Structures are given as C-alpha cells and as structure tokens.
Amino acid sequence: MELTLHEARVIGCLLEKEITTPEQYPLSLNALTLACNQKTSREPVLDLSEAQVQDALDSLTKKRLISEQSGFGSRVVKYKHRFCNTEFSELQLSPAAVAIVCLLLLRGPQTPGELRTRSNRLHEFKDVIEVEDCIKQLISRTKPILKQLPREPGRRESRYVELFSETSANVVTTSDHTDKPHIPPVAALVEHGALVARVTELEQHVATLTQKFDELIASLT
C-alpha cells in the first residue's frame, strides 16, 4: 500500500487513539481532525480542514483501510481503521510492532532510542534492545515494512522509516543519494545528545497535557 501524507496521518491517529483513549474510539470527523492537527507528537505539524480529512477518509475507504460506524443512538458517523489486526486486515502485528509503526507514521523517521522514549503510552518497552529486536523482525518480513536509513551526523543511532507512505519513500530515496556526512567533534555529539534528550522529555510533558485537553474537549462535545 502507498499512503499520502494525509492518509498516513489519519491511519496513525486512529492507531494511536485506539490504544491511548479506547473509550473514545472510533473517532468522529471532528475528533480525528483534532488528532491530525495536534501540535505535539506530530512531525510535520499539519493544519488540515475537516474537508481534507474527509477526503483522506474517502480515499482510505476505497483502499479498504477504513470503515464507518454509526447508530447506537448517535447520528455522528465515526471511523475506525482496518489497517492491521482486524478480521479484514492482511497485516497482523504484535502490540510492540503497532506502537513502532504508529510512531513512524505520526512522526517520520526515528532512532530506536527515540521510539522507546516516545512509545510509553502505546507500549512499554523494557529497553532499547527490545525495540531493536522488534525493528529487525519488521525488516526481515517477507515484505519488509521498515527500512534503516544511513546514520546522520551527530547521531549514535541510525533512524528507521516505515514503508507505507509516499513521504517515507521520498526520505528513503533522498537518503540513498546523500553523500557521506562529515562527522562532528565528540563534544558536539555529546551536546547534541543532551539537547535531544531534553527536547524529548519536554515533548512528553506537552503530549500528556495535550491528551488531557483533548479528553476534556471530547467530553464536552
């Protein structure tokens, strides 16, 4: 399958909310639009209209990756994914694999360390080695769904990208044609690593506050 940026964001949000707020899943168009446009835990940050999200939903429905749910005393149509782990899905993934794929769909290429730090609400990895083992399994599938990117300057780990979206395909193509980067001094690497760790910590705090705000909004609608 090949997903557009908007389609990948929709699938990623549905995977995320199914795990983190199951009581609010499936999602209405309004709730899904809010999830797509979150300012935290999203790279890139988007500003999609409901019409754009609906277009993505319509396209995903044609690809048999989305289903609608209505009724139960409500006129509001809600949406759930058929991306993986349903009776209609060809793709069957472990909870750990779902967490990794979800994060890559929502935030683009990431290192195993970043995936472990950012996955605490999706799946509890005991260490980075467990993340790396799961990544290896996803790469070694008959039809791989992840790819390792060349290591970048200032990073001790390589980043990994999912292979479902056209955006990720562009990242892979660009990386394959990138010249070998200049390696910065050790001091710069240490400073960069500390900065990344601090930013990740702040992202977690903001993500928690955003989630509580989203839950409050959902309870009022």
Curated annotation (Swiss-Prot):
Family: Belongs to the UPF0502 family.
Protein name as it appears in the record: UPF0502 protein Sputcn32_1644
Lineage per the UniProt record: Bacteria, Pseudomonadati, Pseudomonadota, Gammaproteobacteria, Alteromonadales
